[in-house]
């Protein structure tokens, strides 16, 4: 990656221009850098899917924000820059008490978790969930939010230290040393869980099906282990009346993203402001060290989010 000077973005009538103070680093950014994550047509090639900063300008049709507002936003791209144009419907006020760096770690993971766990997965208080990749940015968001909303939470992680870190929110299993399916069976008296949030994909498909309760929901949001599931157990799927679904965030329409933002403002912002959940920042790098930030995320050693900060 190279840092270059560019033009300050122009904004449309439904957009805001944000002076970026911090930006979140996400796996799609790494995939984009590697040429494995094609951008939607018409989107800037500059990476960066979430930012926090100060509103500089608002479009003619924007009434929810004014210059000077502290905001965080889910971008369509372009977050790795000092200035970013974002649809106003994907922009939210920074929750009280959070820094720019903390706020920059919110949008991508909270939008993703809300859309997949609560909208697609229909998880309800009193139900149970297994979160694969529990120490990732999405994972730490999911376990905290589900715990705060009254669900029983299980998670898989790759290090014993991460089991300890997640203990306030979830019962975690080291998938490198234990068979997670066997452990979940023991922990649930072989009843299984209501929802599984999966980032692994193909290799976990049948084991995930086996862990679902009747009417359970498997929500797939990644395929880090492979995108092909071989020999799918259709009988288990049918007998359990299971639902298998999945989604991406970047390809959603502006209206869909705005609807998610409104739900977050209503249901999740009060939890953030009350301290019942919080973005976990593993590391922060200045923009000049963006390569190191990517290497940190790519190492898999992180717990929570990696962010970059802008300097004048």
Describe each model-derived feature in a short phrase.
Residues 131, 147-207, 259:
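Adenosine-nucleotide cofactor-binding segment
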Residues 149-152, 157, 203-276, 309-312:
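Glycine-rich phosphate-binding loop and adjacent beta-alpha segment
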Residues 7-24, 36-78:
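Glycine-rich beta-strand-centered segment in the early N-terminal region that forms part
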Residues 79-82, 157-165, 229-233:
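Short, glycine/polar-rich helix-capping loops at beta-to-alpha or helix-loop-helix junctions
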Residues 31, 42-44, 70-135:
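NAD(P)H dinucleotide-binding glycine-rich loop of Rossmann-like/cofactor-binding domains
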Residues 139-140:
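N-terminal Rossmann-fold NAD(P) dinucleotide-binding loop
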Residues 269, 274-283, 291-312:
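C-terminal capping/lid region of NAD(P)-dependent oxidoreductase domains
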Residues 65-66, 123, 212:
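Short, well-ordered loop/turn sites that connect or cap secondary structure elements
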